[in-house]
Design a protein with these regions (language model features):
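Alpha-helical transmembrane segments of multi-pass membrane proteins predominantly involved
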Residues: 1-217
């Protein structure tokens, strides 16, 4: 039952990731990212209880603090500093329907790759492992397709969540210091990227990447 629940939660991860990418407003994307992070915590807890790896329980606690609370808080604070800019509703370069189809293809390709791996985890948690791999491509899709530069930050966050699940599945007994390093990198990356976005907004009053092609350092 343990790995079956992990696979179910993995399915919820890709659903929430897709919703984050197709969300039309920053507040909506923040909300769904927080929901996804709660699901991620559930994956870590379930894996910890299933494998007996107490390290994953610590990972779950760390992920709750950093991903469910801190990252949404930082992104929401950056959004409010810009006075809820109107161009937060900029549409993606890819229509939502095509985004969903592309996400499905990315998961299918990763699933095909995972089924060829001779790893213990690949035998019992194939869907979850494939979905964790697919998050890299889903995040990349978000970064490439979104015109809103604040929305592009979510692409990085999705990629980071995917790497988190991949590590938990492949190395559940890895020392907590590794998790601390991953979480710390993610927090500082989001802080720096958010600060840069706010600075760009203050200088240009635009979050549209199409308007920022002539920015100079």
């Amino acid at each position: 039952m343990g790995y079956s629940l992990v696979n179910i939660l993995g399915g919820l991860l890709i659903v929430t990731s897709t919703i984050v990418v197709v969300s039309k407003t920053i507040p909506s994307a923040i909300k769904w990212y927080a929901i996804q992070s709660v699901v991620l915590v559930g994956v870590l807890l379930t894996l910890g209880l299933t494998t007996g790896a107490t390290e994953l329980l610590m990972w779950a606690a760390s992920a709750f603090v950093t991903k469910v609370i801190l990252v949404p808080f930082i992104l929401n604070r950056a959004y409010k500093k810009m006075g809820s800019p109107a161009d937060s509703t900029l549409t993606s370069s890819i229509k939502p329907a095509w985004t969903i189809i592309l996400t499905g293809l990315e998961v299918a390709v990763c699933f095909a790759v995972v089924t060829r791996l001779s790893l213990p985890t690949a035998e019992v948690a194939t869907p979850a492992l494939a979905i964790s791999f697919a998050h890299f491509f889903v995040g990349l899709t978000c970064i490439i397709s979104q015109r809103n530069i604040l929305k592009q930050i979510f692409g990085y966050c999705l990629m980071e969540n995917g790497s988190h699940v991949t590590l938990a599945l492949l190395a559940p007994t890895a020392p907590e210091i590794i998790e601390i390093g991953i979480a710390t990198d993610a927090i500082f990356a989001v802080i720096i990227m958010s600060a840069v976005v706010v600075r760009i907004w203050n200088d240009t009053k635009s979050l549209d990447s199409h308007d920022l092609t002539e920015l100079k350092g």
